[in-house]
Regions:
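A short, charged/proline- and glycine-enriched loop
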Residues: 61-68, 194
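A Rossmann-like FAD-binding core segment of flavoenzymes
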Residues: 116-166, 177-189, 193, 215-269
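Conserved hydrophobic helix-helix packing surfaces used for dimerization/oligomerization
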Residues: 68-70, 91, 178, 197, ...
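Predominantly flavin-linked oxidoreductase catalytic cores and closely associated redox partners
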Residues: 193-221
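Glycine-rich FAD pyrophosphate-binding loop
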Residues: 89-105, 221-230
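N-terminal Rossmann-like FAD-binding beta1-loop-alpha1 element of flavoenzymes
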Residues: 66-92, 206-214
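Glycine/serine-rich phosphate-binding loop and adjoining beta1-alpha1 elements at the start
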Residues: 1-60, 125-127, 133-135, 146-183
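Residue-level detector of alpha-helix initiation sites
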Residues: 11, 74-76, 99, 203-205
Length: 269
C-alpha cells in the first residue's frame, strides 16, 4: 500500500507532510508547476500517512537480543528508533525533556504541527512497538556512556540536536527585553513580550515566532529582513502577512537599546 511504502521509507512522513518546505522540494520540482499548479504532494502525503497511521496496530517485532540506546528523541532519534525496532532491536530512548519530539515539539508551533500528531506517533510507533522512553533523563550526568555499555547496550546513537541560538554579536544583545527565537518557541507562555515586538530576521523560524507572538497577545509585530525578499517560504510568508505581520526590507541591526533596535540600510550592488 502507498501508506506502507511511505512509512517504510520515512517513519515521520506524516510530520514531513505538515512542516517540510515543499515549495523548495517535491512541489518545487514538479514538472506540472512549469505551466500551472504543481501536484500538491504535501496534501497527498498527509492524507495517506494519517490514514495509514490509524491502522498501525502491529506489536513489537521478534527480538534479536541486542539493545540499542538512542540519546535524544528529535526527528533523527525517532526515525532511527522505529527502524531499529523493525529489525528486532530492543530500543530505549533517553530524552532530556518531559516529552518526545525534540525540535518538532519544542521548536515548531502547534498551529503548524499539532502536538497530538507527536502524541499519537509515540503511542502507535514507540509504545506499541516495545520502544521504551526515559523522559527527563540527561546522558552525561547521573548516567554516562560507560554506564550504557555496562548494561549491555551494543550501540548508542546520539541525536541531541542543535539547541544553541545564533547570536547577532551586537551591543545590547544581553538586555532583558531581548530573546532568542529558539528559546521563545520552546515555551512561549513563559515570556511577557508586551504589545509591540520586533523580529530580527525573515526566515521560517521568524515566521513561527511572529505568528506565535500574535496569538499570544502582541498587537504590532514587524520582521526586519537584510535582503529585499524574505528568506521564508512563500507559503509561510503569505500566512504571516494575512495574520497581520509587517515587514521591513534591506535593514541590518547594529545595536539594541532600551528603546528598541538601531538599524542601518543595506545596499545591494
Amino acid at each position: 500500500a502507498a501508506g506502507e511504502m511511505l512509512f517504510l521509507n520515512n517513519p515521520l512522513s506524516i510530520v514531513c507532510s505538515l512542516v517540510c518546505d515543499h515549495e523548495e522540494q517535491c512541489e518545487g520540482h514538479c514538472v506540472l508547476g512549469k505551466k500551472g499548479a504543481p501536484v500538491h504532494f504535501s496534501a497527498i502525503e498527509n492524507y495517506i500517512s494519517s490514514t495509514y497511521s490509524t491502522k498501525m496496530v502491529k506489536g513489537p517485532a521478534p527480538s534479536n537480543g541486542m539493545r540499542v540506546a538512542i540519546v535524544g528523541s528529535g526527528p533523527a532519534g525517532l526515525t532511527i528508533a522505529v527502524i531499529l525496532a523493525r529489525y528486532g532491536y530492543q530500543v530505549t530512548i533517553f530524552e532530556g525533556k518531559d516529552k518526545i519530539g525534540g525540535v518538532l515539539r519544542y521548536g515548531i508551533p502547534d498551529f503548524r504541527l499539532p502536538k497530538t500528531v507527536l502524541d499519537d506517533f509515540e503511542d502507535r510507533h514507540l509504545i506499541r512497538k516495545g520502544i521504551r522512553v526515559r523522559p527527563n533523563t540527561t546522558i552525561g550526568s547521573a548516567i554516562g556512556i560507560d554506564d550504557l555499555f555496562r548494561d549491555g547496550y551494543r550501540a548508542i546513537f546520539i541525536g541531541t540536536g542543535v539547541w544553541q541560538p545564533r547570536a547577532l554579536h551586537i551591543k545590547g544583545e544581553t538586555l532583558g527585553h531581548v530573546h532568542f527565537a529558539i528559546n521563545y518557541l520552546n515555551n512561549p507562555d513563559s515570556f511577557r513580550l508586551g504589545e509591540r515586538v520586533i523580529v530580527i530576521g525573515a526566515g521560517n523560524a521568524a515566521m513561527d515566532v511572529a505568528r506565535t507572538a500574535l496569538r499570544k497577545g502582541v498587537r504590532q509585530l514587524t520582521c526586519f529582513s537584510r535582503t529585499p525578499e524574505v528568506a521564508a517560504s512563500q507559503h509561510e510568508f503569505s500566512y504571516a502577512t494575512l495574520e497581520g505581520v509587517n515587514f521591513e526590507y534591506c535593514k541590518a541591526p547594529v545595536e539594541i537599546t532600551d528603546e528598541g533596535v538601531i538599524f542601518v540600510d543595506v545596499r545591494e550592488d
